Amino acid sequence: MTQAWWLNPCKSVDTDAVENAAARQQQLTKPAGSLGRLESVAVQLAGLQGQVKPTLDHVWISIFAGDHGVVAEGVSAFPQEVTGQMLLNFVSGGAAISVLARQLGAQLEVVDLGTVTPSLSLPGVRHLNIGPGTANFAKGAAMTRAQGELALQGGRDSVLRAKAAGAQLFIGGEMGIGNTTAASALACALLDCPVVHLTGPGTGLNAEGVSHKAQVIERALALHAAQRGDALQTLFNLGGFEIAALVGAYLACAQEGVAVLVDGFICTVAALVAVRLNPACREWLLFGHRGAEPGHRHVLETLGAEPLLELGLRLGEGSGAALAVPLLRLACDLHGQMATFAEAAVADRPA
């Protein structure tokens, strides 16, 4: 394992499994293509799992949490203390993702990379204590390189635990007051896009608040403009600990051969960073939904991603990806359990 492990090769998709799964789809008792994207996603999962009939019995959800120094600029509708409070809610079973994980029978892990709440120690939470949140990126780099690499490794470690537990699908979620500001800034820097196109209300800012948020991002982009061509340094300049952990998790999944279901805007920006760092990881990423945050559509289009759902979500936590899991499971069930024309003694072409 090299020091810059995130640049290591990604696993190859099993092309034989893809071909055989596609051939099976042609033999199932239905008109070819009549199940639409349920067919293509089952074939895609076959290639990622290396088996003609993929299954999604074991789903792992990691929630990465971290606070953001840029909140000092007044860019969020909620106080920073909410990040630490939500950690308790996650492990107590009261958060949306907690309910979804229970209903899906998924393993839920909560990782605190660094919040402003001092000496936070909660049973059931992994506290990595990288720092008391990031620094204010409108005035300097959000994190040091050492902190950034620790956050990347934190994401990778979650994936290694998931793989050891037999996970067939990895979902990363996030919690961090101020993190839509960080994600918007990152996306603007990487895509060289107008700030107003990628900046939205987050957890509930009004129009005046969104305008102020955009102005803060403009200042930060000007401050860090010289390093905009370096995706990793841009992540460290403008990102959050939890965003860096997501980047590390997505890259580790591609290297370890675990399929990823990407959640909303913040997670999709993390996916964009991951693809910029190691383009081969893109094959391992599926996208759960298109959310309400205005920048989400643009980042999805840049990645050539077709999300499974569009429900106007803007919660985060991995919730949109979790909601798409039943759809993926049913796609696998249809693919694996439907009869072929030969098995059912049904004519496979019109009279």
UniProtKB/Swiss-Prot annotation:
The enzyme's E.C. designation: 2.4.2.21
CDD domains: DMB-PRT_CobT
Record: active site: 317
One MF annotation (Gene Ontology) recorded for this entry: nicotinate-nucleotide-dimethylbenzimidazole phosphoribosyltransferase activity
Pfam families: DBI_PRT
Record GO biological process: cobalamin biosynthetic process
Superkingdom: Bacteria
Keyword set includes Glycosyltransferase: yes
Reaction(s) catalysed by this chain's protein: 5,6-dimethylbenzimidazole + nicotinate beta-D-ribonucleotide = alpha-ribazole 5'-phosphate + nicotinate + H(+)
InterPro entries linked to this entry: Nict_dMeBzImd_PRibTrfase, Nict_dMeBzImd_PRibTrfase_bact, Nict_dMeBzImd_PRibTrfase_N, Nict_dMeBzImd_PRibTrfase_sf
Keywords: Cobalamin biosynthesis, Glycosyltransferase, Transferase
Pathway where it operates: Nucleoside biosynthesis; alpha-ribazole biosynthesis; alpha-ribazole from 5,6-dimethylbenzimidazole: step 1/2
PANTHER family listed in its UniProt record: NICOTINATE-NUCLEOTIDE--DIMETHYLBENZIMIDAZOLE PHOSPHORIBOSYLTRANSFERASE
Function: Catalyzes the synthesis of alpha-ribazole-5'-phosphate from nicotinate mononucleotide (NAMN) and 5,6-dimethylbenzimidazole (DMB).
Family: Belongs to the CobT family.
Record NCBIfam families: cobT_DBIPRT, PRK00105.1
Protein name: Nicotinate-nucleotide--dimethylbenzimidazole phosphoribosyltransferase
Originating organism: Pseudomonas fluorescens (strain Pf0-1)
